[in-house]
Regions:
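Extracellular loop and loop/strand-boundary signature of outer-membrane beta-barrel proteins
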Residues: 48-55, 95-103, 150-157, 190-195
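Gram-negative (and chloroplast) outer-membrane scaffold detector with strong preference
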Residues: 71-149, 173-175, 210-212
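Predominantly the C-terminal beta-signal and adjacent terminal strand-loop region
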Residues: 88, 165-212
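Short glycine/proline- and aromatic-enriched beta-strand/turn motifs that initiate or cap beta-hairpins
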Residues: 19-74, 211-212
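Transmembrane beta-strands of outer-membrane beta-barrel proteins
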Residues: 28-36, 77-81, 110-112, 125-131, ...
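Cleavable N-terminal export/targeting peptides
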Residues: 1-28
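Residues that define the transmembrane beta-barrel architecture of outer-membrane proteins
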Residues: 28-30, 59-65, 104-110, 123, ...
Length: 212
């Protein structure tokens, strides 16, 4: 009876140890952090109509902040989620002579991400993409000023949802084993049933990732 108990305990121990080793082979760690970005927002299509009759499609520099979290699986696969916010102000758009200060296009989006990463000594190049959705808020002030408390007579405020596919490539630079500087370039491909500006264009991200 004692031998049977020992055999059962040994078998259970071996099973748990094997499962642990197998899990370790699959799970290679995790990472997460924040990234700032700058990019260019293309207006598409050009049919946002103001009360004055003009059709506009603002384009210009956009900037913002966000972050991502990933689980590292097997040798190369990383999966996780991300979320970002980005703002284009009228002063850095091609409509700065037409739109008043205070006009902006603000975009927020988030989704799931997956990429392939090659863990070299100091450099970890990666390529992948994300899929998700978001919303874009557009404020176009044609007459008036943001410096007073008067009601604006000619302005448009609009909010629209969208879905997106976002291919990207980049690399991590291993500052230490736990801390990586990350650099990423992507191009958001947005789609929506509505006929206003879509948040389409390239962005360059720079940030810090904490790895475990």
């Amino acid at each position: 009876m004692f031998r049977v108990k020992v055999l059962v305990i040994f078998t259970l121990f071996a099973t748990v140890a094997f499962a642990k080793n197998d899990s370790t082979a699959i799970f290679q760690g995790c990472s997460g952090g924040m990234m700032g970005h700058v990019g260019y927002l293309f207006g598409h299509p050009a049919d946002a109509t103001l009360p004055t009759g003009e059709k506009i499609s603002p384009q210009g520099m956009t900037y913002g902040l966000g972050g991502s979290m990933r689980v590292h699986l097997w040798k190369h696969l990383r999966v996780g989620m991300e979320g970002f916010s980005s703002t284009m102000k009228s002063g850095v758009s091609d409509q700065h002579d037409f739109l008043q200060d205070g006009s902006y296009i603000r975009t927020g989006w988030g989704g799931v991400i997956a990429d392939a990463c090659w863990r070299l000594e100091k450099i970890w190049p990666y390529i992948g993409g994300s899929v998700g959705g978001g919303a874009m808020r557009t404020l176009s002030v044609v007459e008036g000023s943001q410096d007073d408390w008067l009601a604006e007579q000619v302005a448009v405020l609009h909010k629209q949802g969208f879905g997106y596919i976002n291919p990207y490539l980049g690399m991590d630079y291993c500052i230490t084993k736990r801390i990586h500087a990350t650099f990423r370039l992507d191009w958001m491909l947005a789609f929506s049933n509505e006929q206003l500006v879509f948040p389409t264009g390239p962005r360059l991200y720079i940030g810090i990732m904490f790895c475990h």
